[in-house]
């Protein structure tokens, strides 16, 4: 289910109204978030939800075991890291190696392999929730937060639909405690959330999608394009990719605000950066932060 789809425009108000007016208390709201998030994710392909649940269960158990068996905590952490990265790598690169195997099989005279053998669908957003799962395991290991024993709470943290498929990639120390607290409706938060959602839609539909028309027209026949056309196409592409990424992030942040959840800022005017280093501190901030912290402490 895409943010800029008719289905999402029906889905969001229904989830919002039931969340605030039918659910009572933290537990029921967390459960409602989990159910709606899995419905949202399963809209692409219901099989994706099984992988998300597996990742959630493994990381949930990892956190508890790290606390329960401190002498084995580092081994437990690395087992969870290798398992999650192994799953991510298998889905990310299976088709690449399968295509190579297909070519080798044909070259050796064995014929082409069946399509179902060599192609696997890449689950939407698998990188985002994998990194977020690892964030939790790392933070528990570093004693930045205690392991949660509430399964629904943890599932809500890892599957929260506004940022499930396109980020921001949240640190467990920021997002998980918000699901551990009671939340009350705030009119100011709702208004601010809607403002950010509309701004995100503007970036996506008015800027990114319109720039994409020009980019596709120029690069679909780049051999015949002039130097000026190619330069213009490159310029339009920079606005397209920014509008896509930051637009989706704004919609996610605004949607989170509707439910009393504050997500981190993900883009901070990257094209006004002074240098490359400054650019990467402003572009997809949550991803860059995750890599910096993960590299420093694992």
Which sequence ranges carry the predicted segments?
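Membrane-embedded transmembrane alpha-helical bundles that form the catalytic cores
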Residues: 1-295
């Amino acid at each position: 289910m895409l943010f800029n789809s008719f289905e999402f425009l029906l889905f969001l108000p229904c989830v919002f109204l039931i969340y605030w007016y039918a659910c009572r208390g933290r537990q029921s709201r967390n459960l409602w978030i989990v159910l709606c998030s899995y419905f949202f994710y399963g809209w692409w392909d219901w099989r994706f939800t099984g992988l998300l649940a597996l990742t959630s269960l493994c990381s949930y158990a990892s956190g508890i075991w790290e606390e329960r068996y401190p002498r084995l905590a580092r081994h437990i952490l690395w087992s969870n890291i290798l398992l999650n990265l192994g799953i991510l790598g298998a889905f990310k690169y299976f088709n690449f190696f399968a295509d190579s195997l297909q070519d080798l099989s044909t070259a050796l005279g064995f014929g082409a392999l069946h399509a179902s053998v060599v192609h696997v669908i890449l689950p939407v957003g698998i990188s985002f929730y994998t990194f977020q799962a690892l964030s939790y395991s790392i933070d528990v290991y570093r004693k930045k937060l205690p392991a949660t024993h509430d399964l629904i709470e943890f599932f809500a943290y890892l599957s929260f639909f506004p940022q499930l498929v396109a980020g921001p990639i949240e640190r467990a120390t920021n997002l998980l405690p918000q699901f551990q607290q009671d939340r009350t409706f705030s009119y100011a938060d709702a208004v601010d959330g809607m403002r950010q959602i509309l701004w995100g839609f503007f970036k996506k539909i008015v800027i990114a999608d319109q720039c994409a028309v020009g980019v596709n027209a120029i690069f679909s026949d780049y051999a015949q394009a002039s130097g000026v056309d190619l330069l213009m196409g490159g310029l339009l592409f920079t606005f397209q990719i920014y509008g896509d990424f930051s637009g989706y992030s704004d919609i996610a942040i605004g949607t989170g605000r509707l439910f009393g959840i504050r997500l981190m800022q993900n883009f901070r005017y990257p094209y006004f950066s002074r240098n490359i280093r400054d650019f990467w501190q402003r572009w997809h901030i949550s991803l860059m932060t995750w890599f910096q912290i993960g590299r420093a402490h694992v």
